[in-house]
Amino acid sequence: MSSMTPRETVNALDNHIIGQQKAKRAVAIALRNRWRRMQLPEEMRAEVTPKNILMIGPTGVGKTEIARRLAKLANAPFIKIEATKFTEVGYVGRDVESIIRDLVEMAIKMLREQETAKLRHKAEDAAEDRILDVLLPPARGGDPELEDNSTRQTFRKKLREGQLDDKEIDIDVADSPMGVEIMTPPGMEEMTSQLQNLFSSFGSQKTKKRKMKVKDAFRQVRDEEAAKLVNEEELKARAVEAVEQNGIVFLDEIDKVAKSSERSGGEVSREGVQRDLLPLVEGCTVSTKYGMIKTDHILFIASGAFHLSKPSDLIPELQGRLPIRVELDALTVDDFKRILVEPSMSLTKQYVALAKTEHINLNFTEEGIHRIAEIAFQVNERTENIGARRLHTVLERLLEEVSYSASDMPNDQTVDITAAYVDEQLGEIAENEDLSQYIL
């Protein structure tokens, strides 16, 4: 669990997301409150539930990115799902409990990667020994100790230096059992898991001799050895705890399941999805193949643009489960300028790095960046407002010629992206509303 203070969390988010300080503060406080809860006595800890958040703002202003970066900072299991994917129980489609099942799968994957990284050196040593056993089978009647100290060490050195990478060897590797996909109704995942385990056990522990290059064999054997070292039962128990105590669910498009006075039809199903979400957000127990998961302390961050509906159109019970409301601001020209330059991996830095691979120096001037920001803002105002995503479209169109011709240009040529260059490439399209609707 992250022990970052709210100020540290906001500063870390500032490296990737421009503006939206209110939203950053809200999620930073929510993250810190988790740490505070874990410092409380056991009996009080169970009573303190997370204060779920509702983010309100147009598309492309940073709602999803804030939640995604927060989960990375917290090193917490995180899942982003669209509320529109789900249907009311009784209708054909996914039921909302699959959110928690997917979250547990994410936690298992995350913890397995962490555990494998920790055991990497042990697994590599074991893989080296298995490959050396193939390269240097012990001689009959020879002294294995003597061999180990001389020839084996020479070969180990060659193996580590990559001198044997392209040598082909015959090695016994695990024979992966045939995958069996079983379709079952929602809620029957436990039975599916048991059946799949039964089928896979028929082919488990089998090895197969295969001819492979040393570098490929090393990679496969290392993964096999790492899998042997990971304690699966402990991993599952830790994943369940991580989900229950630190899980974050990002519910996008929540406004699309809200009632609206302007829409008619389909309201029953929409309200049904909200009612199904209620117990999940409030706290219930969900059955998964890894055990029962309590959702009482999972943090839910809901978001929506609320163009055609208002937060008050959500059913009152769900409104009550989302006590923290944060409005995100629409982006201005200055915001666009900052987005182009300030983030640690900003779009301009990405394009400069991509051009560098072709030995081209791409130079964005200050007035060029200002003009790009202006065009992105103008097109958003005149057509559909898609927020910062508009910059991707504008930059791709702007640098299309450079991207196409870069490999034909002389090495170390500098291309200056000035305001004049931007107008030359985009001016006509940006001014013509009909064209910009289709191209930008």
From Swiss-Prot:
Entry keyword set: ATP-binding, Chaperone, Cytoplasm, Nucleotide-binding, Stress response
Any single biological process term in GO: proteolysis involved in protein catabolic process
Binding residues for ATP: I18, G60, V61, G62, K63, T64, E65, D252, E317, R389
GO molecular function terms listed in the Swiss-Prot or TrEMBL record: ATP binding; ATP hydrolysis activity; peptidase activity; proteasome-activating activity
Cellular localization per UniProt: Cytoplasm
GO cellular component: HslUV protease complex
One Pfam family this sequence matches: AAA
Subunit structure: A double ring-shaped homohexamer of HslV is capped on each side by a ring-shaped HslU homohexamer. The assembly of the HslU/HslV complex is dependent on binding of ATP.
Family under the similarity heading: Belongs to the ClpX chaperone family. HslU subfamily.
Function according to Swiss-Prot or TrEMBL: ATPase subunit of a proteasome-like degradation complex; this subunit has chaperone activity. The binding of ATP and its subsequent hydrolysis by HslU are essential for unfolding of protein substrates subsequently hydrolyzed by HslV. HslU recognizes the N-terminal part of its protein substrates and unfolds these before they are guided to HslV for hydrolysis.
Protein name: ATP-dependent protease ATPase subunit HslU
The species this protein was found in: Marinomonas sp. (strain MWYL1)
Gene: hslU
